[in-house]
From Swiss-Prot:
It comes from the Eukaryota. Pfam families: 7tm_4 (PF13853). This is Olfactory receptor 5T17. The keyword Protein biosynthesis does not apply. The gene is Or5t17. The chain crosses the membrane at residues 38-58, 67-87, 112-132, 146-166, 209-229, 250-270, 284-304. InterPro entries: GPCR_Rhodpsn, GPCR_Rhodpsn_7TM, Olfact_rcpt. GO terms for molecular function: G protein-coupled receptor activity; olfactory receptor activity.
Length: 324
């Protein structure tokens, strides 16, 4: 559907005869009212399921003492990240689906980018740390408690957040140091980096290189950690004679590998490509998938085949029903 130019809430500032934009318009998926109502209902349902699933998993780990080990502590942090990740973007999207005023301030756009890149990058590092945790638990189970003590997993979690904050700060500062003096319409549902670079009237060549090499380096390092960790896990599996033992390991590791594959696959598609291959409409759908849909899927992926989580869930529900 062709779009009509949006002039509402187009605030600009005149600086040295150059009009600087102070408010952006998030165009979203479509102008069709009925489709926007459908999208509102769909994304509201996804958001509710995301919060219930992720926060429910956090409560489950806190409540059940059998889940008090590093593997589930990492899972708790991942669930908290996913709840925050979704909450940074979804509420504004929901408002825009039903509103004619789809504006977001310059500062609001920068804040949104800073937060979602922080949570997204932190999740990359955390998934690598979780793979390393699985390697230690399976390859050297007798030394697991020592090698993955609080003195190890707490710094890993802190390092993941630190890396996420640093990466997000670099891109947010680099992006919002550019000049925006033409159209203020962002062809996206949130303030992502590629559509903002496309909107800038400055030379964005260095920004594109920064995005490619920073995102590419993080992807390369974290995926390499995952592959090496699971290489050792595979060696450990080959040494196990028990079919039941192998099934248990595949059940635990399969969930993590599924989550890693989906997350990193979409990240690679989004950010580690030549700029000539970018299609903003296509990227909008893909980025919405990894920022909105994946946080909903993670609790399902990590708990669906996990006997300990399902047993803890049954016990918690039973206890609640008895008290009622």
């Amino acid at each position: 559907m062709p779009r009509t130019p949006s002039y509402t809430n187009t605030k600009t500032t005149q600086v040295n005869n150059v009009t600087e934009i102070t408010v952006f318009i998030l165009l979203g998926f479509t102008d069709d009212v009925d489709m926007n109502i459908f999208l509102f209902i769909l994304f509201l349902a996804i958001y509710v399921v995301t919060l219930i699933g992720n926060l429910g998993l956090v409560v489950l780990v806190i409540e059940d003492s059998r889940l008090h080990n590093p593997m589930y502590y990492f899972l708790t942090v991942l669930s908290s990240l996913d709840a925050c990740f979704s909450s940074v973007l979804t509420p504004k999207m929901l408002v825009n689906f039903l509103s004619k005023n789809k504006s977001i301030s310059f500062a609001g756009c920068a804040t949104q980018m800073l937060l979602f890149v922080t949570f997204g990058t932190t999740e990359c590092f955390l998934l690598a740390a979780m793979a390393y945790d699985r390697y230690l638990a399976i390859y050297s189970p007798l030394l697991y408690a020592v090698r993955m003590s609080p003195r190890v997993y707490v710094p890993l979690i802190i390092a993941s957040y630190t890396g996420g904050i640093l990466h997000a700060t670099i891109h947010t500062v680099a992006t919002f140091s550019l000049s925006f003096c033409g159209s203020n319409e962002i062809r996206h549902v949130f303030c992502d980096i590629p559509p903002l670079l496309a909107l800038s009237c400055s030379d964005t060549h260095l920004n594109q290189l920064l995005l490619f090499y920073c995102a590419g380096s993080i992807e390369l390092i974290t995926i390499l950690i995952v592959l090496v960790s699971y290489g050792f896990v595979l060696l450990a599996i080959l040494k196990i004679n028990s079919a039941e033992g192998r099934r248990k390991i595949f059940s635990t590791c399969g969930a993590h590998l599924t989550g890693v594959s989906i997350f990193h696959g979409t990240i690679l598609f989004m950010y580690v490509r030549p700029s000539s291959n970018y299609t903003l409409e296509q990227d909008m759908v893909v980025s919405t998938f990894y920022t909105i849909v994946i946080p909903m899927l993670n609790p399902i992926i990590y708990s669906l085949r996990n006997k300990d989580v399902k047993e803890a869930m049954r016990k918690l529900l039973k206890r609640k029903l008895v008290h009622e």
